[in-house]
Swiss-Prot record:
Phosphorylates serines and threonines, but also appears to possess tyrosine kinase activity. Involved in DNA damage checkpoint control and for proper DNA damage repair. In response to injury that includes DNA damage, NEK1 phosphorylates VDAC1 to limit mitochondrial cell death. May be implicated in the control of meiosis. Involved in cilium assembly. It is found in: Nucleus; Cytoplasm, Cytoskeleton, Microtubule organizing center, Centrosome; Cytoplasm. The keyword ATP-binding applies. This is Serine/threonine-protein kinase Nek1. Keywords: Amyotrophic lateral sclerosis, ATP-binding, Cell cycle, Cell division, Ciliopathy, Cilium biogenesis/degradation, Cytoplasm, Cytoskeleton, Kinase, Magnesium, Metal-binding, Mitosis, Neurodegeneration, Nucleotide-binding, Nucleus, Phosphoprotein, Serine/threonine-protein kinase, Transferase, Tyrosine-protein kinase. It comes from Homo sapiens.
Amino acid sequence: MEKYVRLQKIGEGSFGKAILVKSTEDGRQYVIKEINISRMSSKEREESRREVAVLANMKHPNIVQYRESFEENGSLYIVMDYCEGGDLFKRINAQKGVLFQEDQILDWFVQICLALKHVHDRKILHRDIKSQNIFLTKDGTVQLGDFGIARVLNSTVELARTCIGTPYYLSPEICENKPYNNKSDIWALGCVLYELCTLKHAFEAGSMKNLVLKIISGSFPPVSLHYSYDLRSLVSQLFKRNPRDRPSVNSILEKGFIAKRIEKFLSPQLIAEEFCLKTFSKFGSQPIPAKRPASGQNSISVMPAQKITKPAAKYGIPLAYKKYGDKKLHEKKPLQKHKQAHQTPEKRVNTGEERRKISEEAARKRRLEFIEKEKKQKDQIISLMKAEQMKRQEKERLERINRAREQGWRNVLSAGGSGEVKAPFLGSGGTIAPSSFSSRGQYEHYHAIFDQMQQQRAEDNEAKWKREIYGRGLPERGILPGVRPGFPYGAAGHHHFPDADDIRKTLKRLKAVSKQANANRQKGQLAVERAKQVEEFLQRKREAMQNKARAEGHMVYLARLRQIRLQNFNERQQIKAKLRGEKKEANHSEGQEGSEEADMRRKKIESLKAHANARAAVLKEQLERKRKEAYEREKKVWEEHLVAKGVKSSDVSPPLGQHETGGSPSKQQMRSVISVTSALKEVGVDSSLTDTRETSEEMQKTNNAISSKREILRRLNENLKAQEDEKGKQNLSDTFEINVHEDAKEHEKEKSVSSDRKKWEAGGQLVIPLDELTLDTSFSTTERHTVGEVIKLGPNGSPRRAWGKSPTDSVLKILGEAELQLQTELLENTTIRSEISPEGEKYKPLITGEKKVQCISHEINPSAIVDSPVETKSPEFSEASPQMSLKLEGNLEEPDDLETEILQEPSGTNKDESLPCTITDVWISEEKETKETQSADRITIQENEVSEDGVSSTVDQLSDIHIEPGTNDSQHSKCDVDKSVQPEPFFHKVVHSEHLNLVPQVQSVQCSPEESFAFRSHSHLPPKNKNKNSLLIGLSTGLFDANNPKMLRTCSLPDLSKLFRTLMDVPTVGDVRQDNLEIDEIEDENIKEGPSDSEDIVFEETDTDLQELQASMEQLLREQPGEEYSEEEESVLKNSDVEPTANGTDVADEDDNPSSESALNEEWHSDNSDGEIASECECDSVFNHLEELRLHLEQEMGFEKFFEVYEKIKAIHEDEDENIEICSKIVQNILGNEHQHLYAKILHLVMADGAYQEDNDE
C-alpha cells in the first residue's frame, strides 16, 4: 500500500471495501478493493484469491482492468482501474424520469454483452450483474466490474447451486433454489436492460417474499412503446422463465441490430479474437489449412499469426496445437521474405525492360483483382462457417446440459461427469494443458470432421490455384515463374508444388497423431474421473458414518431431556390439581347461589310477562268496547249526513274489509258505512280530476265546499273504523285489496247494497278479487278512479296510496288549480300518507291496529306482532300497523296517499316537515271553524287540501303530533286539537321563523328532562317517540338498519342526531299556538305513558263523548307497564323494513322518501331531543338549546362536578386509544347515584359541542 495514497472510500459491500487511491508512481487514480481475509475461513480465502485469478485473466476493453493484487496486514488488496464516470445506477438516477435514447441504450448494452461474452467464453459466471457493478469511463465506455462472487465453472455443464446476487436481479431458478448456469447472468442482463429502458427495476416489491413471487411469476410492466419492437422483444426474451428459452450472449450478439454496433467498440483484431479465435482454440490447426497459400492471403495469414502470440496464457490451447501453429508461422514468415526478395529483382527487370514492366503491371492488376474477389468469397465462406459453428455449439451445449442432467439424476456418483476432471481448467494457473485437453475432448468427434473438411478444401484450393496459375502463365512467357505475384515464394514457391503430396501426408500424419493423443487423453481422463468418484464416494461414506455417530449422541441427549421435561410437567400438573381442588370447594357453594338467583330471575320475568299479557287483554277489551261506542256515534252522524245529502244509509255499503273478514258482531254492524269513493260520488266528486278541482276551488271560495269535504272525511273515518274492526281477521290479501284501489271497496259495497251499485254502473268490473289480480292490473284501475278522490283507508288501516301515480299526476295538478301557497305545495309528496281523516284515525287506527296486527303478523313477524303487549296497545299498534301496512303497500309518497292513516305515524312527521308552517295554519283555521265537525270536517278538509295542497291539514295534525316523537309531535297534536276547536281561515301564509319560535314552546310542553330521559331509556316512549325509541333500541341492541340513515350516523355513538333533529324539527312543526300547549303537554304525557294516546288526540273530536273516551283511554294507557310498550317496539323493530311503528313517526317512510322535503328534513329532525331542556323562551339557534342544557346541568350538578365529568368524557372521546365503552362506567362512578341519570345529557352535550366545533360553522 505504500505505492498508493488513499483518497476516499467510494463503496462497501458484503465482499469488502472499495477505496479510491492515487498511485505515487504514475499519479493515476485506481480503485483498491480491500478484502479482510484474516477473519475468513480457508475456503473463503481461497474464493477471494480466486477472484484475483479470475481478474488476472480478464483483459477486455469492457471489463474493469485488473492491475495487481497483494496481501498486507491480514487483508487482500486488488488494484483496478478507476472509472470516473461512476456506475450505471447513478447515471440512471440522474435522468430523473427522462428516458434514454434507444441508441444510447443499445450502445451500452452491446458493450455489456461483449464483456459478458468474454466472461462466459471462459466458463465463468459473474453472478452479480447489476447496474451498480457496471461502470462508465471518462469517454463513455462501459466496463463490467466486481467479480467478487464470480465462479469459474469446471465445465459448462456444471450448474452452480449457491443463491448469490442482488435480490432485484435474482433469476427464477435461484429463487426456486434450482441449479443455474450462465443463463442466470442473462436474466440479470435483462434486468439491467429493462432498467435502462424504464429507469425502474423490472421486479419491485415491499418484501422479499413478494419480490420472489413476482420474479417466479415472471410478470413485469411492459417497456414503453417509445422503443423499437426489436428492443422490446429482446427484453421479453431475456426474461423467459425457463433458462433454456433465454438466449445466450453469443446469440444476442448475433442479432442484426446488435451485431452492427460491435464494430464501434471493438477493434478488428479484438473482433477476430473474440469471434474467430474461439473456433481456432477449439479446432487447433483448422484455420491454417483453410488459408490458401496464395499471395493475397498474406495479410490475412499474418493477422492470425499475431493473434496466436500467447494463446496458452489466455485460453489454455493444447500444446500440440501451439507447436503446429508455430510451425505454420515459420512457414508463412519465409513467404513474406521471399516476396520481398523477389520484388527487388522485379524492379531491376523493370528498369531494364520497360515493356515487360508494363505487361507485368497489367497482369498484376488482373491478379490483384482476382485475389480481392477470392478474398471476398473466402470471407463469405468463413462467416457462413462461423454461423454454422455457433449454431452447432449452442445445440451441442444444450445437448450436453440435458445429458448431464439425466446422468446426474440417474447416478449420483457419476453426476459430475467429465466436468470434475476438467476442474483444473483456469481453476488454478498450473494445470492449463490438461484442462485444455479436457475441454477439447468433448468436441473430438466434431473436430476431426472439421479438420478433414478444412484439409479437403485446402487441397482442392491448391489444385485449383495450380491450374489457374499454369493456365495464366502460358501467355506471359516473359515473366519468370518465381516472380509471379500469385506465388509469394517466387521460384521456391514454384518448386513447392511438387511437394504438395508431402504436405498432405504430413497433415494426415498429424491428424492421426492427434486422434491417438485424444483417445489416450480420454482414457486417462476416464481413469482419473473414476478414481475421483470412488474417492469422493468413500469420503461421503466416512462422513455419513461420522454424522450417524454424532446423531446417536444427540438422540441420547434428547431422550434424557424429554424425560426431565416430562417429570417437571407431571409435577406441575400435580401442584395445579391440588390448587384446583381447593378452588373447586370454594366455588361450589357460589355456583349454587348463582344458579338459584338465575332461577329466581327467570321466574320473575315469566310472572311479569304473564301480568303484562293479562293487562293487555283487559285493555284491549276496554278499548274495543269504547271503539264500538264511538263507531256507533259516528255511524249515526254519517247516516244523518247521508239523509241530508239525499242518500239512504241503507244504500251505503260497508267498507271492503268487513265483507271479507267478518269480525265481531259489533264490527259487522259497521258494514253499513259507505266507502270514500261512494261518498265522493254522492257529493259530486265523480272520480274525475275536474270535479275534484272544482271542489277544491269551492272549498277555498265557500264554506259549503268546506263542509262537504268535512262530511266526506267523516264518512271516510267511519269507513276506516269499520275496516279496522275487521282488520283483526283480514289477511294480507285484504290489505292489498284495500290499498290497491277503491274499486274493490265499491265491489264489496255492491255486495252489501246492490241497489246503490246500479246507480254507479261500475260494479261489474269490481267483482274480480284483488288478491288474484296482478299489481299492474289493479293499479291501472286505481289510477283511473283515485286520481282526485279522497282515498279511504282500507280495513287494514293502511293508508291508501296509488302506486302508479307520480306526484304530478294528481296532487300537483289539483294544487296548481287550487291557487294554494307554495309552502303547502312543497309537501305534496310527504303528505300523501296523511289524507286519512283524523276522526277515522282516532278509532280506525284502533280498529285498523287490530286488523293490521293480524296482517302484520302474516306479513312481517306474526309472533312478535301478535304478542299480547301489541294487542293491549292495539291503539298504538294500530297506528304502527297502519304505518306498516303503508310501507308494505310500497311506502308510496304520492299525493294520492294523502288520506292515509299516518296521522300519528312518523310519516306525519315527514309531512309536517315538508309543510312545516302551512299545515299547522290550515289545521288551526279548520279547528277554529267548527269543533264538532272539526275532527271530521277538518280531516275531510285536510284530505281535500292534501290532495290539493299536498297534505295541508291532515298532514299537519299527523305531522304535528308526530314531528317530534316525544316533544314536538305531542305539542303539535295538542295544538292542533286546540286549533281545531278554534275556527280560523282555511289557509294562512306561514313564515318559517314561526317554526323556530315553536322550538321553545315544544320544549316547554315536554315533560321534565328527567322524565323524558327516563322514558327514553326504558324505551317506553309514546308512539310519537317511536323514532327515538327505534333508534335507542337499535343502538342498544346493535340492530343497525341500513335503510335508516339516522342509525347509520349513530352506529358507534350515542344517538346524537336526536339533539339536532329536535332543534331543527321544531321549525318544521308549523305555527303552533301557546294555548294549545296544554293539550300538547297532556298528549306528551300520554305518549310517554301509553303509546296510543296520541292517536286519540290526533282525531281531536270535540264531542263530549269522544273527549270522555279520550280521557278514559289516556287513563288506561297511563297504567300500562313499560314492558308492554317495549315489547311492542321490539316487534315493530323486527319489522324494521316496514318500520310502521306505533309511535307514529314512520322512520322508514321518511328514509324511503328522500325526494320530499320532509324526508330530507326527517333525517336530521325526526328524532326529538331528550326534552331535558324545558324553556319557554323562543330560541333562534341550535346553540341556545345547547347552552340551556349546559346551564340546566350546571345548576343541577354544580359547576365543578359538571365540568369534571364534561372534561372526562371529552378526553376519553378524543383519545383514539381509549375504549369508549369504559367511558360510561368511569363517568357514572364520578356522578354517583344522585346524578347518574344525567350522564346521557352530558354525553349529548359533549358530542354536540364536538360536532359543531369540527363541522358546523353556523
